[in-house]
Amino acid sequence: MAKRPGSPGSREMGLLTFRDVVIEFSLEEWQCLDHAQQNLYRDVMLENYRNLVSLGIAVSKPDLITCLEQNKEPWNIKRNEMVTKHPVMCSHFTQDLPPELGIKDSLQKVIPRRYGKSGHDNLQVKTCKSMGECEVQKGGCNEVNQCLSTTQNKIFQTHKCVKVFGKFSNSNRHKTRHTGKKHFKCKKYGKSFCMVSQLHQHQIIHTRENSYQCEECGKPFNCSSTLSKHKRIHTGEKPYRCEECGKAFTWSSTLTKHRRIHTGEKPYTCEECGQAFSRSSTLANHKRIHTGEKPYTCEECGKAFSLSSSLTYHKRIHTGEKPYTCEECGKAFNCSSTLKKHKIIHTGEKPYKCKECGKAFAFSSTLNTHKRIHTGEEPYKCEECDKAFKWSSSLANHKSMHTGEKPYKCE
């Protein structure tokens, strides 16, 4: 009786692994996802891993799962990097193989555990040269050990990637990771993938779209965990508390970002000027200084801005909206920073002090103007006669000598 495809005895089928159902994002792709999409990805990957474990497939916990459980960003994980004095990462077995211990002993433990019933004769060792062909060796466990032992030194000197596969289809799938070819395309959104399993995983997102709805505001969500987190907006729940200052937050990711205030950590560095930032979004905004990009355009007058917040403030010029009101005198402003400066009039606060003479000022701009008395700086120059002045008002008065203008009339 012939065995049907997929039966336990079929050598073509192989074992399902976490690598078959995982989706990996680059830094650029991860930053394109919004908060809800990142949470959905996190939930789907964790659920996939739990499903594999529940099916009795013995897989050790991948670094990606550990990272997601700790609410870290998954693109931080470096895969398939093999450099001097670093362990070889056999991602198919999800086990580190330290060079000083030797690969032979490690494989003798791993292979029987992972491929015990299929036998060693079915194993193939491939030395994958990035963007190139693969060298194949078939045979028993001795040949496997010999192949890896002879190539061990080369592994740490080149950018080759050594992987062990239980079937030829797995090795072909692995090659696509090096070539970068994406043959599988989503018909709905047009996004392409290297592997059909990744496309299937992506399509699950479509089937889950808007399955869960908030009873409070009616907003739809793709998964129940995202809905549960959303409900905190209505309940005001803030389960994540900073151990340093006691401040509480609705999201764990917000707490992670907040902690950098205390630690001073700035993990995001501008490649152009070397300036570092605590948030990736701040770095993205900063980069526009170098590129000159202004993606936010006013529909009313066509003026463009590099920051969305700048566009929001600008729009109030057209609408006349002034959402920030002074509690002391009732005067309204279109910008929170303008209200903050205005409040100083009522409090009498003068936080900006001149180091030269000790005189204090309410505004930083007034202090900067005052400093010119000490420095002698005269930044305002007359185009007519080249005479320079410390203040713009002095230049304006001077210009009337050339124009003959007499703006002040006796009533």
From Swiss-Prot:
It holds the Pfam family zf-C2H2. GO terms for biological process: regulation of DNA-templated transcription. Residues 16-87 form the KRAB domain. It is found in: Nucleus. It comes from the Eukaryota. GO terms for cellular component: nucleus. GO terms for molecular function: DNA-binding transcription factor activity, RNA polymerase II-specific; RNA polymerase II cis-regulatory region sequence-specific DNA binding; zinc ion binding. Its main location: nucleus. The keyword Glycosyltransferase does not apply. InterPro entries: KRAB, KRAB_dom_sf, Snail/Krueppel_Znf, Znf_C2H2_sf, Znf_C2H2_type. Keywords: DNA-binding, Metal-binding, Nucleus, Repeat, Transcription, Transcription regulation, Zinc, Zinc-finger. A zinc finger (C2H2-type) spans 156-178, 184-206, 212-234, 240-262, 268-290, 296-318, 324-346, 352-374, 380-402. Belongs to the krueppel C2H2-type zinc-finger protein family. May be involved in transcriptional regulation. This is Zinc finger protein 679. The lineage of its organism: Eukaryota, Metazoa, Chordata, Craniata, Vertebrata.
